[in-house]
Amino acid sequence: MNDSILLGLIGQGLDLSRTPAMHEAEGLAQGRATVYRRIDTLGSRASGQDLKTLLDAALYLGFNGLNITHPYKQAVLPLLDEVSEQATQLGAVNTVVIDANGHTTGHNTDVSGFGRGMEEGLPNAKLDSVVQVGAGGVGNAVAYALVTHGVQKLQVADLDTSRAQALADVINNAVGREAVVGVDARGIEDVIAAADGVVNATPMGMPAHPGTAFDVSCLTKDHWVGDVVYMPIETELLKAARALGCETLDGTRMAIHQAVDAFRLFTGLEPDVSRMRETFLSL
């Protein structure tokens, strides 16, 4: 067996993350013993440690890479030696590659993960006008992926309209055109009704946040509907959309493809997407 791989995930509330299992199983399948540690600043021996201390520890201990999640995706940028152009434009990093010399490079595979998920799950979706509900969390990455995968007009709706507009400004600046506008999520149903598709980028649909982010009665069979939530895989939104005959994109595709792209960056190996999906769905 070749050299082992040591990876980690820095964030808060990591117990349910499926990312470690995907990386460990894929590494082993490719003949590389892989250890992937959860580094939870709320619920582990890393509790209370600042981000720089944890990043330095990973360098000293010979980690090959780190995934970064809430609440550190923005805070990690100034601590890195290099950041990809895309991650710099978004102001968020979720993947840090550490080379043999300890040089750190930040990437954002949330963007590529959602984009690849769209290519795979909604290859023929109409993209003239799309609504994204939710500007927090992975909202920036989802919006960037939508616009760079063909969406002509994207309306990002949030209860905090200033946050929605701030996201729009970031994406418009990154892509060099006025593709995104921030709008109020209150009464968004009329806007959704006139759109080609809608993506839920809020936590609504998770066990801790049951329900939907908008009234699904505005949907018709002509809409396509996406969701970033993957626990459960069939959210209330997707269940309602499928009952209408809508094309749908569940949250597993983004979750799997962001890990696929991160594994490639960490190891230089070509991951087996089907195998990583099988691991994800078995958990």
Swiss-Prot record:
This is Quinate/shikimate dehydrogenase (NAD(+)). Homodimer. InterPro entries: Aminoacid_DH-like_N_sf, NAD(P)-bd_dom_sf, SDH_C, Shikimate_DH-bd_N, Shikimate_DH_fam. The active site is at 73 (proton acceptor). Disruption phenotype: Cells lacking this gene are unable to grow with quinate and shikimate as substrate but do not affect growth with glucose. The keyword Glycoprotein does not apply. Shikimate binds at residues 17, 69, 73, 94, 110, 258. GO terms for cellular component: cytosol. Its EC number is 1.1.1.-, 1.1.1.24. GO terms for molecular function: NAD+ binding; NADP binding; quinate 3-dehydrogenase (NAD+) activity; shikimate 3-dehydrogenase (NAD+) activity; shikimate 3-dehydrogenase (NADP+) activity. Involved in the biosynthesis of the chorismate, which leads to the biosynthesis of aromatic amino acids, and plays a key role in the quinate degradation pathway. Catalyzes the NAD(+)-dependent oxidation of both quinate and shikimate to 3-dehydroquinate and 3-dehydroshikimate, respectively. It catalyses: L-quinate + NAD(+) = 3-dehydroquinate + NADH + H(+); shikimate + NAD(+) = 3-dehydroshikimate + NADH + H(+). Belongs to the shikimate dehydrogenase family. L-quinate binds at residues 17-19, 69, 73, 94, 110, 258. Pathway: Metabolic intermediate biosynthesis; chorismate biosynthesis; chorismate from D-erythrose 4-phosphate and phosphoenolpyruvate: step 4/7; Aromatic compound metabolism; 3,4-dihydroxybenzoate biosynthesis; 3-dehydroquinate from D-quinate (NAD(+) route). Induction: By shikimate, quinate and QsuR. It is an enzyme of class 1 (oxidoreductase). GO terms for biological process: amino acid biosynthetic process; aromatic amino acid family biosynthetic process; chorismate biosynthetic process; shikimate metabolic process. PANTHER family: BIFUNCTIONAL 3-DEHYDROQUINATE DEHYDRATASE_SHIKIMATE DEHYDROGENASE, CHLOROPLASTIC (PTHR21089:SF1), SHIKIMATE DEHYDROGENASE (PTHR21089).
